[in-house]
Amino acid sequence: MSLTLSAQTSVDNSVHQFKVADIYGNIFDFSKLKGKKIMIVNTASKCGLTYQYEALQELYSQYKDFNFMIIGFPSNDFLWQEPGSNEDIIEFCEENYGVTFPMMSKITVKGSKKHPLYQFLTQKSKNKFKDSRVTWNFQKYLINKDGKIEKIISPRTRPDSQEIVSWITDGQ
């Protein structure tokens, strides 16, 4: 089952305006994350950075009770490193890394078919933060409790880096 991924009309320029399809085909409403810090990360199962799933899961397990959420978005945009179906992806993530953080349906994060959420994340005219581009799998967008982008983290930076952990725990 395929759900249309959409954005609600909103003047708040935040990720809270988005509803997307999760990896099981259910609606995931970002407005339910108001008051939580969020890491949005594009993922791939056949990438040299796939090992980051382990650190993402550890980070999620450690901080999920501290108003922190990780949202994974599988993408096949970089050297076709996420070729599988949603079913293949979640099976891989659960069996190999014990992933329990929310995973969304596979999307496009660059180019003319870029998903509306990633249009928001990468365009200053929409996010009021800065223009950016997704450079590779496992790029991280750190979103504050108001749904605004605060930091964009390189794909090569480990999810459990001091920079990210400090951001999560700041203000706790």
Model-derived features with residue positions:
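Amphipathic alpha-helical repeat scaffolds
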Residues: D22, N42-K46
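Hydrophobic h-region of N-terminal signal peptides that target proteins for export
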Residues: M1-A7
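Structural microenvironment flanking redox-active thiols in thiol-disulfide oxidoreductases
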Residues: L49-H115
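Proline/glycine-enriched tight loop/beta-turn segments at coil->beta junctions
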Residues: L33-I38
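N-terminal "domain-start" segment that seeds a small globular fold
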Residues: A7-S31, Y51, P116
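Thiol-/selenol-based redox modules, centered on thioredoxin-like
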Residues: P116-Q119, Q123-Q172
